[in-house]
Structure formats: structure tokens, C-alpha cells
Amino acid sequence: MMALAGSCFAADFTDKSADPNAMPEVPAEFEVQLFAGEPLVRQPCSMAFDAKGRLFVGMGPQYRSPKPETPGDSVVMVLDTDGDGQADSTKVFAIGFNAIQGLAWHGRDLWIANAPDLTLVRDLDGDDQADQYVRVYTDLGNLEHGLHGLNWAPDGKLYMSKGNSKGLN
């Protein structure tokens, strides 16, 4: 089991009694260890593995309070370059999103739920950075009840959750 530590929203909780380093309890035949945490991964809101088994994380500084001066949401590759089982670096894969709420790989395409858009990005030249950004659909509502949870199914269709905000009604 892999664990990512972080929060999808920037809240100032006054109750600090919970141990931020505590891991979930699991049966004896399992082990849980932290793979990546802050500051390496900040405000993670979604994650997906590509066909090579690499972890991609959508980070959301825009979540809940988007402002023009706040950096846009991004997708980063989270890397374990020394093979010790813990992430030690990231590489920016795609930038400039408003509110990443879901990631799903399909072939070379990374599909991104990015309120109010559904976007796909591609790395065309193999440098591990997205070169092509395609807005597949827009007007999918706000980030609260908008597009979330992307999953490609065995039937070849992309499934997603969408709440009661405007678009696709």
C-alpha cells in the first residue's frame, strides 16, 4: 500500500491533537509506509499511475479559493530516484489548471477533471512534460459538485462522477 500525505484544501484546523505521522492500521501481512508527503507533494487532490507504473499527482493550490495570483493547479510525476521506496523529487508534467479533481491515463493521454473542463494532455516528444493540451468538454460546473473521479473501464468508456452543478443535465 502506498500513502501520500497532504490535504486537498488549505484549512486552518485548531485541533492539532492527531499525529500527522500516524499510519493506518492494517492486517499483519500488509505494510504501510509513507511514499511522499509535504513539502514534496503539496495539496494533492488526485493521483494516477501511467503504463510504466509512474505516479502522477494532481496538486491543488487553487482548490476552494481560486485567485489570479495563486499558482495554477499542476500535475507532477513523483519520483524515487534512489530506489529506497520513498519519493525524493518531482517533475512537473502539466501546468495551468483551475481545480484538478481527477486523473486517469488512457494510452499516452492523461485525462484531467479540471472544473469546469475535461482536459486531456499528451507528451508528444518523450521528455515527460505535456506538450499538447486539449479541452475535450467544458461547462461541467464548479469544483464543488463538478466533474470528479475519472476512470477508464474495460468497455473502453470513460466514467466519471458529476454532482448537481450545471452542465450535462
Describe these PLM feature segments.
Residues 1-7:
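Bacterial N-terminal signal peptides
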Residues 9-169:
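Beta-propeller domains with acidic blade repeats across secreted/periplasmic ectodomains
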